[in-house]
Amino acid sequence: MSFAVSAEAYAAFMGRFSEPLAPLFADLAGAGIGAGQRALDVGCGPGAMTAELARRLGPAAVWAVEPSESFARAAARREPAAWVGQAAAEHLPFPDDVFDLAAAQLVVHFMTDPVGGLREMGRVTRPGGVVAACVWDHAGGRGPLSAFWRAVRELDPAADDESGLPGVRAGHLAELFVRAGLGGTEATTLTVHVRHASFEEWWERFTLGVGPAGAYLASLDADHQAALREQCRRLLPANPIEISATAWAATGRT
């Protein structure tokens, strides 16, 4: 996956959606979690969910891990009183049973081993604690990048999009929770609405080279990029452009 980019590029590309998603996800994941309890943000990126958890629990009660060094540094700058380290979900650097909540916002579909990553989240969560995750509904065409990938498929039917990633189709995220041994799994959806003042504002973020969408665009020559841009323009409404993005979400208990 193309996440060898700056934290600023990632925040510009996905932060417009992950920032409003974080409070909704925290409401779901953190129900029943309060003062005196500890939370872990897995795959924290530049820190959208980390900051939301810190706002609710206090930064001293929040830990975060992120495999990208630049993203981890950005999260640490954003929440300097929280503990932020560099680690992958599949190999969490914590003993068993230390957190009341382990949450992964927009991460599971990019894990090398999603079941293993969720199992690790369960391992570090105390008995009766909560494990939570959410991923965009890429397979159902309700993700924040769905218009882009629809345009891609219309021009290049053989292109790989994000619809085959783990957890992005109906029921699959909850299935991964069950396979990871988490009990009491419940599934729902979370939806955010993001307004772009113009098509140019919407399109510019894709040129930053972030994630599979950015990598695909970067792989095209100038003529094919221009054709894709115009195809996207035809698919999107007139300015301003409002994108509704829906994520699958699941919770389970250890």
Task: Explain the meaning of each model-derived region.
Residues 4-16:
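Class I SAM-dependent methyltransferase Rossmann-like catalytic core
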Residues 38-92:
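Class I SAM-dependent methyltransferase SAM/SAH-binding core
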Residues 90-101:
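A short acidic, Gly/Pro-enriched loop at the edge of an enzyme's catalytic core
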Residues 100-114, 137:
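A short SAM/SAH-binding and catalytic strip from SAM-dependent methyltransferases
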